[in-house]
Amino acid sequence: MAGLPDFLIIGAARAGTTALHSYLRQSPDIFMPAHKEPNFFAFEDDALDCRGPGAEFINNSVTRMSDYRALFAGAKTGILLGEASPLYLYSPKAPERIAHHVPGVRMVAILRNPVDQAFSHFLYATKYRIEPVADFTEALRREEERMAAGWQPLFGYSRFPRYAEQLDRYYARFPRGQILIRTYEDYLADPVGLMADILGHIGADRSFRADMSEKMNAGGRAKNAAFQDFLMKSNPVTRAIGMVVPKAARLRIRDRLAAMNMTRDDRMPKAAKAILLERLGPEIERLGPMIGRDLSGWLE
């Protein structure tokens, strides 16, 4: 349908989608809105009332078709249109809506070890000061009460990466060849090759080489929690800066300062890993044959 995407990055969260969005936008064959994660197909015509920390991420999603089309209004004629909303893989409603509006759309999903993905999501939430619990194991134990209270899907750490269940919904509506599935390990091992595969899949020039020098959306823990709070939460200084500095520039500065304040900490608590393997192990075992990959390493 004219004015709607030719391709979608549907997931997964914390699996390099921010970087892919940046790399694909550099291609002269492609137009992607600067607004990553509009989430339209997850929430079309929904009255959004998400609660809990960081609820604005969901509540500010694009829900009207006219607003969604407007995201692509600046594209040149004949160019490929696309967007990246990792929530589409998670959303039960997204596959049906995508099939209705853009049945021929090409899709890409990068899947990360769900145990690592869940912990990375937790670190992301602590980085942006929206996770009120410092211990990951305790956060996992609070999942059900948080979901029942209407908190945003991010806080369903072990619910978010149920890839086999999620792909079932897509394969019920689309030919498998329409969805390119790769893993986060593929991205880390050969980002140039992965980009070429994605470009070829969506119909762009696969020989295009993007600038991949900037590290994006890295996780970790804050070295100085008070400084991280200052950066991420509204206060008189940040509000004053917001009055004179454009939002895009302000967010770039904030994220760079936040990255400087982060330290790599990949030590997942053993109790948390045990909980995740119990919850997600059957999903991993089913996913491997589904996508034709040996994922036994994800169970270790």
Predicted regions located by residue number:
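The conserved 3'-phosphoadenosine-5'-phosphosulfate
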Residues: 35-36, 168-274, 293-300
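Active-site rim elements
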Residues: 52-56, 85, 152-161, 182-185, ...
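A short acidic, amphipathic alpha-helical/loop segment
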Residues: 94-97
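Short beta->alpha connector loops
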Residues: 86-90
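PAPS-dependent sulfotransferase catalytic core
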Residues: 1-85, 100-110, 114-147, 174
